[in-house]
Amino acid sequence: MRVKGIRRNCQHLWIWGTMLFGMWMICSAVEQLWVTVYYGVPVWKEATTTLFCASDAKAYSTEAHKVWATHACVPTNPNPQEVVLENVTENFNMWKNNMVEQMHEDIISLWDQSLKPCVKLTPLCVTLNCIDKNITDWENKTIIGGGEVKNCSFNITTSIRDKVHKEYALFYKLDVVPIKSNNDSSTYTRYRLIHCNTSVITQACSKVSFEPIPIHYCAPAGFAILKCNDKKFNGTGPCTNVSTVQCTHGIRPVVSTQLLLNGSLAEEEIVIRSENFTDNAKTIIVHLNESVEINCTRPNNNVRRRHIHIGPGRAFYTGEIRGNIRQAHCNISRAKWNNTLKQIVEKLREQFKNKTIVFNHSSGGDPEIVTHSFNCGGEFFYCDSTQLFNSTWNVTGISTEGNNNTEENGDTITLPCRIKQIINMWQGVGKAMYAPPIGGQIRCSSNITGLLLTRDGGNSSSREEIFRPGGGNMRDNWRSELYKYKVVKIEPLGVAPTKAKRRVVQREKRAVGAIGAMFLGFLGAAGSTMGAASLTLTVQARQLLSGIVQQQNNLLRAIEAQQHLLQLTVWGIKQLQARVLAVERYLRDQQLLGIWGCSGKLICTTTVPWNASWSNKSMDQIWNNMTWMEWEREIDNYTSLIYNLIEESQNQQEKNEQELLELDKWASLWNWFSITNWLWYIKIFIMIVGGLVGLRIVFSVLSIVNRVRQGYSPLSFQTHLPTPRGPDRPEGTEEEGGERDRDRSVRLVHGFLALIWDDLRSLCLFSYHRLRDLLLIVTRIVELLGRRGWEALKYWWNLLQYWSKELKNSAVGLLNAIAIAVAEGTDRVIEVVQRICRAIIHIPRRIRQGLERALL
């Protein structure tokens, strides 16, 4: 009985151990995650691409900028859309913005294209014999001299190249350079044009007025322009108020120095921007919040236009000048300018604390840098800005004017201007332009929206900082407008872990993987969590192809508007390049989806298991707390690896499907008798026979080794050895009866086929016996496991019933106890309340009884 009890206890321990092990396996199992591909998620990366321009230029206009714009730009979108990206922070850097470089190249193209049909004045690079020209001012009836205008004669080639004749023309003193003669005491009467030794001079065409029009820069399909809307953004660093646009605002390509004209204004207060305020070599861009009007005038004059033939099909325009053509000036309100300087000083003092701010004139250089140069009505003005930058501001904010001239103390600051006809071009070294004189009065009114300043270096311990007007690098002009934009590339593919797995034809070889990229027509879901953004994939995915189609329509409209010209300029090539790039990116993404087996799907599951080394965040952290941009940064280093694993997994899946389809050829019974199949049968039969023969040889060798170890050496496998009989059993035939000895020899066979048959028979019997034994063992094990499992289930069922009954009884007892306790408590409470009420009711009686006793 004791042994039986011990055995029964061991049985229970084994059952309990099995159940605990199973429960531990279930609880310790981690749910497997799989890579899922998403198409159309809001993710972008910084990129450089070819932008195209849009403008509202009229095709019939002859102004140079508008002619260029109609050839180069598409019409603007009448309903531009701007989508604010909630919960998005993006880094901007205005000093490393490729949009600035593109605009710089485009404006150079604008000027070059405007001047391309104009005449080069290389034949005028000859010796000029000049004398001073007196000009009559017909309004005041006075003679103006001083050598401002030179009347120069020179020899020039006519339409016939071997013929030379003498001509004369009027040049301004600033446009010619004297040539010294051998005799130093002689008067300088020999001159040359100022840029002949360094530049190729081009004469501006008569129709060129250089009047800038707003130009919008647009991103091609598959790209987007991010815009920073922070009102105090300094040009670098993170921006929290971000939106996405397809095109920038209209930017006027105004070429000027020192002062920025007709640009955009800061929304709240003045903003100063510099790549490094401590480096005095870096330009400081001042962005004003209120414009200061500047009115420039060149008084009326009469120009009798004449032209000189300088070769076949080329003419040089000059003329007789009546009136002082060089007398020009610009007016600025003193109060507005001083108020603007005061606000600029406050902002500069934030960077240079407790220092006196000094504004001074330019330190020298080319005339374009020393003066405020700009174009007004086709004439190039060079205005002296000394009066604008001639003040000192101490720490208390009080200004001290550097010049006490009474004329300056008026309400208006008047800047004297000079006009040049030979201009040093800003596009690069070695280019110059001759602007023919323009008759009549010239007026232009502009708005100063910014300043370009440079800071003097030197002793850092000095108590004052000197700022001077700068400029000359037109990239700073464009940078002052493009500071809040950046171009990004939309990545339409994204990958993330999910619990869903693709159902495929099973096979063991599998890969691992996950990650992605994404596309976005509108990036409105960029700040949403991954779970929320995945619900808008259809809208965003459609934007990619529709954006390509829209861009193609814009290009075709532009070509149709110019079909009478059909000039495929560099801008036409840019348009085509942008469209081809968008199509290529779209096809590349579709190709990847096809390779991964996800064609036409926005959400595509895979058989690639998610590796925790890529990201060990939980599903809730990923889908409910992270945006797609944050997730992209998390797994960016593993994107290529996951793409490769998805591709390998899909290749394996296709191989599995191919092998499955190959089994269909056995569906037809007639295919079993194909000669190809018969050859395959013969090959399999030969392999089986060879294997059996090899097994027979192995078993024979093992048998010999076994018998040798027992001390028995057979003479031959085919020798028939008689069986010895005991002394009590005489020799006889088999038919005589009696049990023969077990040690008798095996049957002797003759011939190769008989030997093979005997071996096959023995091998089959051996295999049969072993398989039968194995089957019996497996059956016994399964029966034992089934019985034990059934007993375990019954035990668990009884245990469950027992505990259910116990829990039920406990619950009933608990409810009864609670009911009894509540009832008793309720009775006590009622009794106490009754006593209190009776006591209160009996108070008057007790009082009366007390009074009665007192009276007695």
Curated annotation (Swiss-Prot):
Region named CD4-binding loop: 362-372
Segments of this protein annotated with the region Immunosuppression: 574-592
InterPro entries: Gp120_core_sf (IPR036377), Gp160 (IPR037527), GP41-like (IPR000328), HIV1_Gp120 (IPR000777)
Keyword check for Lipid metabolism: no
V5, as annotated region: 460-470, 462-470
Annotated region (V4), positions in chain: 383-417
GO terms, molecular function: structural molecule activity
Region feature (V2): 152-196
Post-translational modification, as annotated: Highly glycosylated by host. The high number of glycan on the protein is reffered to as 'glycan shield' because it contributes to hide protein sequence from adaptive immune system.
Residues listed as glycosylation sites in the UniProt record: 87, 134, 140, 151, 155, 183, 197, 234, 241, 262, 276, 289, 295, 331, 338, 354, 360, 390, 394, 404, 447, 459, 611, 616, 625, 637
Signal peptide (from-to): 1-31
Swiss-Prot/TrEMBL site (Cleavage) positions: 510-511
One Gene Ontology cellular component annotation held by this UniProt entry: virion membrane
TM segment ranges: 685-705
Motif (YXXL motif): 712-715
Region named Fusion peptide: 511-532
Chain intervals for the UniProt region annotation (V1): 130-151
Disordered: region residues: 716-742
Positions occupied by motif Di-leucine internalization motif: 855-856
Lipid-acceptor residues (S-palmitoyl cysteine): 764, 837
Additional information: Inhibitors targeting HIV-1 viral envelope proteins are used as antiretroviral drugs. Attachment of virions to the cell surface via non-specific interactions and CD4 binding can be blocked by inhibitors that include cyanovirin-N, cyclotriazadisulfonamide analogs, PRO 2000, TNX 355 and PRO 542. In addition, BMS 806 can block CD4-induced conformational changes. Env interactions with the coreceptor molecules can be targeted by CCR5 antagonists including SCH-D, maraviroc (UK 427857) and aplaviroc (GW 873140), and the CXCR4 antagonist AMD 070.
Family in the record: Belongs to the HIV-1 env protein family.
Name of this protein: Envelope glycoprotein gp160
Native source organism of the sequence: Human immunodeficiency virus type 1 group M subtype B (isolate WMJ1) (HIV-1)
Top-level taxonomy: Viruses, Riboviria, Pararnavirae, Artverviricota, Revtraviricetes
